[in-house]
């Protein structure tokens, strides 16, 4: 893998993930709706306006129009730029310091970088989730915040809850991205090395990164989905005047309530769309990042 300065990795990582976000945001809208459907209700006791992936896409398009499938895109791009810029920058610093060469170093570096990125990007993810949940009453799931724009949402949250209100749900976001980042970066590096060792493809082919991203995406979805469901619930729940959540007290409380009231499988709600979103997003992000690093590395070598 090409070595580039951490500041360059910040730009490349943010750019790669923003590119991926444009393609995968419609899947994020569907996944968010499915994860909020039947919130804290026993299976079979609530209406289900969203049934599976294809039917859910159609339901969103009928209710909100085709552009409704790109709800929250601006906030999503802001989140991807902030979170992944910080994440790849911190991971690059760890690589530069040789920490990823130590046993378990890739996992630890990925987790720490993910935690920092999640904290910085949390306000954007909060707004993205609330915007994507919004729809007409006939197919509405979860609490409806009725924001009009990203700036309008920012102003409303700031006015009603203060600065700390922008970090509502961060307790679910940090572990979500920690496990996802650790799984993604560790398995991508290992998968790429394994594919190169098999010599099925030219060593510098973009197909190596594509194969590595495909393997990595499976690990990411398996470990991340329960935290993703919890994070969606924490971000979208209504809060009282003191900024406290009215449905959940935090990560553990949310997990326990989902388990008890909806059953353990509810922690994997929206798994199909989650893979259809996280899978391609992981594959495209890692592919774009790897290829952009190659280009930056070559440009750096030509300039010396």
Curated annotation (Swiss-Prot):
Topology within the bilayer: Multi-pass membrane protein
Main location: mitochondrion
Domain of life (superkingdom): Eukaryota
GO CC, any one term: mitochondrial inner membrane
Catalytic reactions on record: a dicarboxylate(in) + sulfate(out) = a dicarboxylate(out) + sulfate(in)
UniProt-listed PROSITE patterns: SOLCAR
Family according to the record: Belongs to the mitochondrial carrier (TC 2.A.29) family.
Free-text function comment from the UniProt entry: Putative antiporter that exchanges dicarboxylates and sulfur oxoanions across the inner membrane of mitochondria.
Protein's recorded name: Solute carrier family 25 member 34
